[in-house]
């Protein structure tokens, strides 16, 4: 059966290894895009997947065969309440030539929304007496600083559908402008509510990083799409398994084997934001979204499907390799608000 190696050399993609459970429910980007912005801006945001519906919109992509026509488009609703700026983190290249943290400058946790947040995260301990020294250290090393990033916190208590109060704390890079501009911009966000409109605009592309739906421990038929053997009397060794795996100690890594399926960290590139809205009556279906409820905060409408289950946090990042650059949002002519409960 020598032809088998040519017609079907392997199963599965090596680019998706290891096929294991994600380390955290909200992954953070491993790389950030180099953006050409005149003014500094955050390069990411966090949202919660609510569900899907469909819209009719005017296709505005010039290279599309349906350009200028009304098209049916499935969309995903992502609820995105404001995030809180917690700390400004400066990165530099250390003596080993590696990227490392120079200093963290934290906001005052005795004021405003951060006072409530401090009760939610009891492990968060900040010595405010040393903050002036840390800010002076940043000012002295501006020429050596490579990146400025902002530590932010989500506010899940603003989303009743989640049923959770413990926030996620993530790090978002500041892009655009000079390092001094990024420092001033980051300081202006500390302790403040940051809406999604300050980061993204309608019509632009975004990369979405998250964790896929978990399927548990699965066999090779479902995990690698191995062809099932015919069920007849001479196939006595089973049908839903591979024909020959060999000794376990010398089994090649590309041979399909059962194991974890789903709950993997994945990145979906160039998803388009076709709408950012505050009027929830324009997006909530009758009776609410199944297994989620009603959207009650600022929301994003993403073209197409998005990875993950309902209520799962998603990290939205500026596109690292955009396929095209939309100038504006497409015109939406109809949004389906019919009940999803039959």
UniProtKB/Swiss-Prot annotation:
Q: A Pfam family in this protein?
A: Ribosomal_L3
Q: What is this organism's lineage?
A: Archaea, Thermoproteota, Thermoprotei, Sulfolobales, Sulfolobaceae
Task: State the organism named in the record.
Answer: Sulfolobus acidocaldarius (strain ATCC 33909 / DSM 639 / JCM 8929 / NBRC 15157 / NCIMB 11770)
User: Which residues does the annotated region (Disordered) include?
Assistant: 1-22
What InterPro entries does UniProt report for this protein, alphabetically? L3_arc_euk (IPR045077), Ribosomal_L3_dom_3_arc_sf (IPR044892), Ribosomal_uL3 (IPR000597), Ribosomal_uL3_arc (IPR019928), Ribosomal_uL3_CS (IPR019926), Transl_B-barrel_sf (IPR009000)
Q: Which HAMAP family match?
A: Ribosomal_uL3_A
- SUPFAM superfamilies (alphabetical): Translation proteins
PROSITE patterns, per database record: RIBOSOMAL_L3
What this chain does, per the entry, is described as:
One of the primary rRNA binding proteins, it binds directly near the 3'-end of the 23S rRNA, where it nucleates assembly of the 50S subunit.
Identification of the protein by name: Large ribosomal subunit protein uL3
Instruction: State how it assembles.
Output: Part of the 50S ribosomal subunit. Forms a cluster with proteins L14 and L24e.
Q: Which UniProt keywords apply?
A: Ribonucleoprotein, Ribosomal protein, RNA-binding, rRNA-binding
NCBIfam families named among the record's database cross-references = L3_arch, PRK04231.1
UniProt lists the family membership as follows: Belongs to the universal ribosomal protein uL3 family.
Q: Which terms does the UniProt entry file under GO BP?
A: translation
Does the keyword Nucleotidyltransferase belong to this entry?
no
Q: Name one GO cellular component term.
A: cytosolic large ribosomal subunit
